[in-house]
Amino acid sequence: MAERMQFLPKREILTLEEMVMLSDILISRGVRKIRLTGGEPLGRKGVMELVKALGQRIGAGLDELVLTTNGTRLEGFAGALHDAGVRRINVSLDSRRPERFGHITRGGDLNQVLRGIDAALAAGLSVKINMVALAKINEDEIESMLSWCAAMALDLTLIETMPLGQVEEDRTAHYLPLDVVKRRLEDRFTLVPSTIRTGGPSRYYEVLELRSRIGFITPLTNNFCEGCNRIRIAATGTVYGCLGHDQKVELRDALRSGGAQSVDELLDRLLAGKPRRHDFRIGGAPAVARHMSVTGG
């Protein structure tokens, strides 16, 4: 699953101040929720200045600031995130077996992530675990992950692998339809559709025996595009209307030279052409060549 990552020149990346400026424009247009993701957002130098600035917008146009992280730096940031106004985070965790976790993450330290989760809970953050379901890799851990999450009072969301970006290993070999996973879980647990709605693509179910909740993100078996109200902004200022399309506008230069009006015009163009649905197909070529780390999960 190795990805050949290439770092960008600093001048091509939005400064933290520019990110705040862009956020203010988006909030003025009606955006009520901002999610910081990656890559790994906590790896950005000075990221807490951005978090603090956005946290000050909560209650002044912004309803919620949330974060998706791989958890490797979470232990040192959890308290500061809560102090800045973050109340919910997602942690990507595809395995709780150290050797397997290291393989999936290409050398990651599982204990470091688990300490981060503990620190987040101690700081008062609500934590949801995101687990990509991978056939022949971690499918034997799904039930135990659900039980662990229930014991830790964490929600769990399972995600189908997506044909996105160029990778060295064929994703088709590891595609695991979540309707299959759901049927397996229903052999042991009672799953009742939840009334919880987060505005995201996940469909939630209450797990009665565990008094917990599980979500399913199914871009392939059950297309979720009809309810999409999201755009994705890369660190370069490129804005994508859809995770599974290359439809985009470039805001960096407009932000630096033209200001809010120029940015608004580009956003209007993007939203007018927002695709009705993605083009993900298992067995086909990747819908887009960019890595998930460019736009986040």
Language model feature labels by segment:
Residues 41, 132-136, 163-171:
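Short histidine/acidic/glycine/proline-rich micro-motifs that form metal-
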Residues 8, 75, 165-166:
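Short, solvent-exposed loop/turn segments at secondary-structure junctions
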Residues 1, 78, 105, 243, ...:
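Short, flexible helix/strand-to-coil boundary loops that buttress conserved ligand/catalytic motifs
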Residues 4, 58, 255:
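Active-site catalytic pocket residues across diverse enzymes, especially alpha/beta-hydrolases
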Residues 13-36, 44-159:
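Radical SAM/AdoMet-radical enzyme domain recognition
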Residues 147-151, 158-297:
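Auxiliary Fe-S-binding modules of radical SAM enzymes
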Residues 1-4, 93-95, 160, 243:
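Short, small-residue-rich loop/turn micro-motifs
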Residues 1-14:
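Canonical Radical SAM [4Fe-4S] cluster-binding loop centered on the CxxxCxxC motif
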